[in-house]
Every structure is written in structure tokens, then in C-alpha cells.
Amino acid sequence: MVFPKLIWMGFFCHLCRGYFDGPLYPEMSNGTLHHYFVPDGDYEENDDPEKCQLLFRVSDRRRCSQGEGGQASSLLSLTLREEFTVLGRQVEDAGRVLEGISKSISYDLDGEESYGKYLRRESHQIGDAYSNSDKSLTELESKFKQGQEQDSRQESRLNEDFLGMLVHTRSLLKETLDISVGLRDKYELLAHTIRSHGTRLGRLKSDYLEGGAQKTG
């Protein structure tokens, strides 16, 4: 009879290995819905939350009460009231977390009543910004085209002025050449006239000298 009792006691102890069977120590929270407890009662920054995390069940039965350590474990086990106290603290923490989430959502909504209204307002703002940017781009393209047209007209005007100056210079050059040709012709005519007059003067001089010699003889 002793051997079966030992087997059942070992089985129940094995089942209770994953549950807390000691007193309630000071607790710490990481800001979420989870609660952690400091085993040594002194919270430090290097305490590992995974090692401090404990599991509670709402039950009035005592855990691991068989065997020689039954009395000590019964003194250290949590009562139903204590477990409800722990659950109440967890609910309070959950309420604080939900309140923080609600405040975060209200900050995100920026005064709007719902995400739908907030998204509609954001979409309107984005649409207005897009319309303004599209309008600005259209005005910029129009100014760019006007600048290109003005540059084209100015370039065309410069080309016309240059061609006009070139035609005028060509006409002046032609006129100058014509004048120079005319002057050359006049110069040749004048030279021919002077030579002709020189020839006539030479002949008259010879005739005069011959006539004077005959009279003297």
C-alpha cells in the first residue's frame, strides 16, 4: 500500500511542478497584460522576466499537499481570495494598458471620432495637396513653354537681323565694286586723254619749231 501512495504522490508533484506554490512576492510589470513577480522580493534591473513569470489558477484546492512537505506547501499556497486579488491587479493593469491604447488612438485620430473620418480627412488633404502640386506643375510647364517661345522668337529675330545686315553689307560691297570699276574706267579714259593731249602738244611743238627754222633760213 505504501508503494502506490508514493507513485500517486510523485505523479501529483510532477503535475504541480509548473505552478507557483510559495508566498506572493512584490510584483513588477513590463507595461503589457503580463505580470511578473520578483522571487527574492528585491527588484533589480537584471531580473529576468521569463524566470519571474508565474502561472496561477483560480482553485480552492491545495497543490502538492501530499507527503512530508504537505503542511509547508499548504501554508505557502495561495488561497482563492489571494488569487482573486492577483487577478484584480491584472485587470487594473489591463485597464491602464487599454487606457493608454485609447489615448494613443485618440492622439492618432487627431480629434476625429473614428478612423473612417480621420482617413477621409487625410485623403482630402492628400487630394488637395496633389491638386495644388499638379496646378503648380501645370503653371511651371506653361511658363517653360512661354520661355521657349520667347527664346525662339528672339532667336528668329536675331537671325532675321543678321540676314538683313548680311544682305545690306553685300549690297554695299557690290555698290563699292561698281564705283571702283567706274573710277578705273574714268582713270583709264583720263590717262588716254592726257596721252592724246601730250601727243598733240608734241606735234604742235615740232610744227612750230620747223616753221621757225624755215623763216630764219
Swiss-Prot record:
GO terms for cellular component: endoplasmic reticulum; extracellular region; Golgi apparatus. Its main location: secreted. It comes from the Eukaryota. It is found in: Secreted; Golgi apparatus; Endoplasmic reticulum. Pfam families: Fibin. Residues 1-18 form the signal peptide. The keyword Secreted applies. Glycans are attached at residue 30. Keywords: Disulfide bond, Endoplasmic reticulum, Glycoprotein, Golgi apparatus, Secreted, Signal. InterPro entries: Fibin (IPR026772). GO terms for molecular function: protein homodimerization activity. Belongs to the FIBIN family. Homodimer; disulfide-linked. Seems to also exist as monomers. This is Fin bud initiation factor homolog. The gene is Fibin.
